[in-house]
Amino acid sequence: MPLENLEEEGLPKNPDLRIAQLRFLLSLPEHRGDAAVRDELMAAVRDNNMAPYYEALCKSLEWQMDVDLLNKMKKANEDELKRLDEELEDAEKNLGESEIRDAMMAKAEYLCRIGDKEGALTAFRRTYDKTVALGHRLDIVFYLLRIGLFYMDNDLITRNTEKAKSLIEEGGDWDRRNRLKVYQGLYCVAIRDFKQAAELFLDTVSTFTSYELMDYKTFVTYTVYVSMIALERPDLREKVIKGAEILEVLHSLPAVRQYLFSLYECRYSVFFQSLAIVEQEMKKDWLFAPHYRYYVREMRIHAYSQLLESYRSLTLGYMAEAFGVGVEFIDQELSRFIAAGRLHCKIDKVNEVVETNRPDSKNWQYQETIKKGGLLLNRVQKLSRVINM
């Protein structure tokens, strides 16, 4: 079971993804003037002399730049880079390949820390070419992956994920193999592949050491969120509800625990309240924010489906009471999801009764095939008309 005092087992927090989260918060209208968030972000910028990052930050957030601070940080950057270049030059003249590689790595890490993305990428790639040991090569690839996540550079992430997989197949150790799964899972969250994220996170719950990305409580929270939307009820029970490592952490995360157990225990009104809290948390999370509407909608459908599976018919009033909402709201919700083909039931408006009409899987597949075939045929016909013209 990972513990908070094992945080030193993580790689360096460079770049620090907390900075990306703070920057995201300040981009939201409701947090744009949040002095506490701005102070925390600027403290990190000053402490690390992040001149290149500060310039980009002021431009993206439309801040008035503190020219004196910028010049001070630029001077500190120039002095440190000069020192690092002198160390590299000395290593090239007087020392061996290992020392040269260490000096190159130190410069790359510094460029990464101050937010010089392009400079850091170039320096890490040069260092990679000088690196022989497989483990050290993988550590550089993890740096590139963190840079990719920090700036949400999809191409950088996908290319280096493949490179990391290839290196691990050559003989990467157990720790780095598991670490890569967490990196992949985090990126899967960012691109809305919740099913793959759940699989990767659940594989690493008991072996998590990637504290350079997030603390263990955040990791467990993410794991619960993606598992609830991705897993069927039996899998959720076996892998999450009965997961000793997850349950231990959930004692200190009561809101997340209530969200998980309220759905599993069919306490739907409590679940809807918890889902509203989760929605607000996701809006403020730099990875989940682009997907919060989709996530909340899918979880509502999931809850409605779970209740409807237990009955052949039930009244709108009963459903409204179960979910703690009004009859009009539940009527509109169900009508919308039925029309979209997401819920297999129909509403008897006269008697205010919901009747389930779940198709068997074969029939459903047949109907889907017919529907998609019709759409494809229409597109082919339109294309043929364009070509004939």
Swiss-Prot record:
Keywords: Proteasome. InterPro entries: PCI_dom, Rpn7/CSN1, Rpn7_N, RPN7_PSMD6_C, TPR-like_helical_dom_sf, WH_DNA-bd_sf. GO terms for cellular component: cytosol; proteasome accessory complex; proteasome regulatory particle. The keyword Heme does not apply. Residues 193-361 form the PCI domain. It holds the Pfam family RPN7. Disulfide bonds: none annotated. GO terms for biological process: proteasome-mediated ubiquitin-dependent protein catabolic process. Component of the 26S proteasome, a multiprotein complex involved in the ATP-dependent degradation of ubiquitinated proteins. This complex plays a key role in the maintenance of protein homeostasis by removing misfolded or damaged proteins, which could impair cellular functions, and by removing proteins whose functions are no longer required. Therefore, the proteasome participates in numerous cellular processes, including cell cycle progression, apoptosis, or DNA damage repair. PANTHER family: 26S PROTEASOME NON-ATPASE REGULATORY SUBUNIT 6 (PTHR14145:SF1), 26S PROTESOME SUBUNIT 6 (PTHR14145). Belongs to the proteasome subunit S10 family. Component of the 19S proteasome regulatory particle complex. The 26S proteasome consists of a 20S core particle (CP) and two 19S regulatory subunits (RP). The regulatory particle is made of a lid composed of 9 subunits including PSMD6, a base containing 6 ATPases and few additional components. This is 26S proteasome non-ATPase regulatory subunit 6. The lineage of its organism: Eukaryota, Metazoa, Chordata, Craniata, Vertebrata.
